[in-house]
Amino acid sequence: MALLKVKFDQKKRVKLAQGLWLMNWLSVLAGIVLFSLGLFLKIELRKRSEVMNNSESHFVPNSLIGVGVLSCVFNSLAGKICYDALDPAKYAKWKPWLKPYLAVCIFFNVILFLVALCCFLLRGSLESTLAYGLKNGMKYYRDTDTPGRCFMKKTIDMLQIEFKCCGNNGFRDWFEIQWISNRYLDFSSKEVKDRIKSNVDGRYLVDGVPFSCCNPSSPRPCIQYQLTNNSAHYSYDHQTEELNLWLRGCRAALLNYYSSLMNSMGVVTLLVWLFEVSITAGLRYLHTALESVSNPEDPECESEGWLLEKSVPETWKAFLESFKKLGKSNQVEAEGADAGPAPEAG
């Protein structure tokens, strides 16, 4: 028994074809939106590629760009099919291709759904990418004279100012690295010598942070050096007083920014997916309604349309059987090829 059977007369078939034509062209616009969102996210990620570990984070924007292009192509073609469906002569050329096209549409809908899920689920991968990339970027902060790294100081400073953050996980991350270049250290100074000697790796470590960590909203002038030395500043206690620095780490700030972007894009992609599913269902109804016309010479006669020719269990069983037959036929062909040509009679 057919699933979700609906009766159609000529008027209903015309309305269905016209409605699907309009929906397909709206879906082309939705594809352009997906393409634009993917392009925007890719540009945003490239802006901060210096503080990201690898290109894994570009999977989501690349996927959005890909499904956006495919959506435009498939729905333009579907719009043409719906436009030609009302003319028997034009419809005849599409008839052999409709079933394969519907199968491709179903496969595309599955891909679109997976892309939407990726928008929500790739937060963990992005977090590890940012953590490692920011850690390396901070190490190169002092290398203003090194070719290929001279831009890193500006990149980190602009990042901390724009996102109101400091360090990787917090401002104390700057205490663990030498972020002041040796070029600007006075090695004749006893303080500099003592600090370098006291460190196993011979690095100049200070309890200070770059100027970009300072919060301009703080009423007190920025304290960026000797942050843990209470006696170095008047009326100051670093353990109880709220520091005039950004307390949030840049990893959390960037992760929240990109996660909110991808979550919004995931919602848009899910809405487009629902729209595409409804179009695929409509195309199936149009296809079966035109196929079941009892008298092709009488366009006014009634016909029936359905989503599945049989029930869901029966359809699944038939699919598995056809899949097994395909596997067996491939196996027979492979065995025949291995056996080689038959020997000639002597």
UniProtKB/Swiss-Prot annotation:
The glycosylation sites are 53, 229
Task: Tell me, in a sentence or two, what this protein's role is.
Answer: Essential for retina photoreceptor outer segment disk morphogenesis, may also play a role with ROM1 in the maintenance of outer segment disk structure. Required for the maintenance of retinal outer nuclear layer thickness. Required for the correct development and organization of the photoreceptor inner segment.
Region of interest: Interaction with MREG: 341-346
Tissue specificity comment: Expressed in the retina (at protein level).
Species for this entry: Mus musculus (Mouse)
This chain belongs to the protein called: Peripherin-2
GO terms for cellular component: membrane; photoreceptor inner segment; photoreceptor outer segment
Annotated compartments: Membrane; Cell projection, Cilium, Photoreceptor outer segment; Photoreceptor inner segment
Starting at the broadest rank, the lineage of the source organism is: Eukaryota, Metazoa, Chordata, Craniata, Vertebrata
Coiled-coil parts of chain:
none
Sorted keywords for this record are: Cell adhesion, Cell projection, Disulfide bond, Glycoprotein, Membrane, Sensory transduction, Transmembrane, Transmembrane helix, Vision
Disease tied to this protein? Responsible for retinal degeneration slow (Rds).
Q: Which family does it belong to?
A: Belongs to the PRPH2/ROM1 family.
